[in-house]
Amino acid sequence: MDVTIQHPWFKRALGPFYPSRLFDQFFGEGLFEYDLLPFLSSTISPYYRQSLFRTVLDSGISELMTHMWFVMHQPHAGNPKNNPVKVRSDRDKFVIFLDVKHFSPEDLTVKVLEDFVEIHGKHNERQDDHGYISREFHRRYRLPSNVDQSALSCSLSADGMLTFSGPKVQSGLDAGHSERAIPVSREEKPSSAPSS
């Protein structure tokens, strides 16, 4: 029996050109030039980058290839500090931080279904800097078994950070599982979400 051995560089079908992350993490953000050819951005001097990108973009890249890069490389994808989702579970508390800066509390629905929290956001078409856009997302997270579901809370900060949190109960106590909606309250101050 023949076994094909691949170099670790090509773990995915298309190697470094195949996406290795979720695409919808930044809801409608812009695109930077280094997102089009990220593997070159660290190897080329900044003095030549601008002209190289202009040459490549102006030299007739097919529309399909351009679209592929737009879809696969969202802004800040490689920077873990800019990840729009942070889930923290320590000894006393379970917290989800989710960047939803394009949504208002009225656009968000947060529900607890058994051992899961479901966060859904949707806004109808509205005008922004680039034209008209509508956005929608749906996230589902498993709650730890010892989270007190009767004390769950959810708030949206002034800078668009949704914070879902619940205290953990000591082992042996009933955490109380049921289906219910969690209201999203609005805070006037920016989020204190961790940066890493």
Curated annotation (Swiss-Prot):
Modified residues (N-acetylmethionine): 1
BP GO annotations: actin filament organization; apoptotic process; apoptotic process involved in morphogenesis; camera-type eye development; embryonic camera-type eye morphogenesis; lens development in camera-type eye; lens fiber cell morphogenesis; lens morphogenesis in camera-type eye
Record region (Disordered): 168-196
Binding-site residues for Zn(2+) 3, renumbered to this chain: 177
Domain of life: Eukaryota
Sites of Deamidated glutamine modification: 6, 50, 170
Residues noted as binding Zn(2+) 2 in the record, renumbered to the chain: 130
SUPFAM superfamilies in the record: HSP20-like chaperones
A cellular component annotation (GO) from this entry: cytosol
Subunit organization: Heteropolymer composed of three CRYAA and one CRYAB subunits. Inter-subunit bridging via zinc ions enhances stability, which is crucial as there is no protein turn over in the lens. Can also form homodimers and homotetramers (dimers of dimers) which serve as the building blocks of homooligomers. Within homooligomers, the zinc-binding motif is created from residues of 3 different molecules. His-123 and Glu-125 from one molecule are ligands of the zinc ion, and His-130 and His-177 residues from additional molecules complete the site with tetrahedral coordination geometry.
Name by which UniProt lists this protein: Alpha-crystallin A chain
Gene that encodes it: Cryaa
